[in-house]
């Protein structure tokens, strides 16, 4: 079936949002007189959300007293500064332009709450260009459940087999596969050191956004 749309996970796939997460964690540590942590430690757990990032930055058990207050502070700060340093990954602007020139639709399916995802898309000038934005607010079950991808395909009125879903986490590939879409795993994203995208069962694995050009071209011609 001919490819009709390309859907992306947000953090670590479409956008490099790590700089904003890292800046907030380091600021919270500094304000408490605590030493900075290696940025890569935070980057490696971004897919685990605020809970994982705060736990890593503060080397703290999520069940410990005071942890929830730190997590809520992190989210409050991120609400205010969620699009200060975030940007498209290198090569992604060109890829999106190619997708649009090819008359394909593209959109975002993320586990990031809409209160964060929408401002970022708007700030980066992507909201008007994308065909849709699916967040946990729109479904009962988030990825790895297939519901977000099923909703995306229904919203676009497309057969899942004509959709490619791109992500940097096993949950993305599981969600897409169970929804019936084609899947692509990216190695340039926020991969936990113990994870190996080659083992996720994706249809294809790439190291750079522009490598998706070949994947898309192949899907368009049915090669």
Curated annotation (Swiss-Prot):
UniProt xrefs under SUPFAM superfamilies:
HAD-like
Recorded GO cellular component terms are: cytosol
So, what pathway does this thing act in? Cell wall biogenesis; peptidoglycan recycling
- Kindly list the GO molecular function terms attached to this UniProt entry: metal ion binding; phosphatase activity; phosphoglycolate phosphatase activity
Q: Which EC class is this protein assigned?
A: hydrolase
Observed effect of gene inactivation: Cells lacking this gene are highly susceptible to fosfomycin, accumulate large amounts of MurNAc 6-phosphate, and show lower levels of UDP-MurNAc and UDP-GlcNAc than wild-type cells.
Query: What Gene3D superfamilies would the database entry show?
Result: HAD superfamily/HAD-like, Putative phosphatase, domain 2
Query: Where do the catalytic residues lie?
Result: 9 (nucleophile), 11 (proton donor)
Cysteine pairs bridged by disulfides in the record: none
Catalytic activity field: N-acetyl-D-muramate 6-phosphate + H2O = N-acetyl-D-muramate + phosphate
Q: How does activity depend on temperature?
A: Optimum temperature is 45 degrees Celsius. However, at that temperature, MupP is completely inactivated within 40 minutes. Loses about 10% of its activity at 22 degrees Celsius and 70% at 37 degrees Celsius within 40 minutes.
Activity's dependence on pH: Optimum pH is 6-9. At pH 4 and pH 10, its activity is only 40 and 60%, respectively, of the maximum.
Q: Which residues bind Mg(2+)?
A: 9, 11, 168
Q: Name one GO biological process term.
A: DNA repair
Its needed co-factors are: Mg(2+)
User: Which EC numbers does the record give?
Assistant: 3.1.3.105
Keyword Magnesium tagged: yes
Which InterPro entries does the annotation name?
A: HAD-like_hydrolase_sf (IPR050155), HAD-like_sf (IPR036412), HAD-SF_hydro_IA (IPR006439), HAD_2 (IPR041492), HAD_sf (IPR023214), PGP-like_dom2 (IPR023198)
Q: Note the PANTHER family from the entry.
A: PHOSPHOGLYCOLATE PHOSPHATASE (PTHR43434:SF23)
The record's annotation in NCBIfam families points to: HAD-SF-IA-v1 (TIGR01549), HAD-SF-IA-v3 (TIGR01509), PRK13222.1-3 (NF009696)
Query: Any idea what job this protein has?
Result: Specifically catalyzes the dephosphorylation of N-acetylmuramate 6-phosphate (MurNAc-6P) to MurNac. Is involved in peptidoglycan recycling as part of a cell wall recycling pathway that bypasses de novo biosynthesis of the peptidoglycan precursor UDP-MurNAc. Plays a role in intrinsic resistance to fosfomycin, which targets the de novo synthesis of UDP-MurNAc. Shows a very low activity on GlcNAc-6P, and neither alpha-1-phosphorylated MurNAc, GlcNAc, or glucose nor glucosamine-6P or glucose-6P can be used as a substrate.
Q: Tell me its family.
A: Belongs to the HAD-like hydrolase superfamily. CbbY/CbbZ/Gph/YieH family. Phosphatase MupP subfamily.
Protein name, UniProt field: N-acetylmuramic acid 6-phosphate phosphatase
Q: Which gene encodes it?
A: mupP
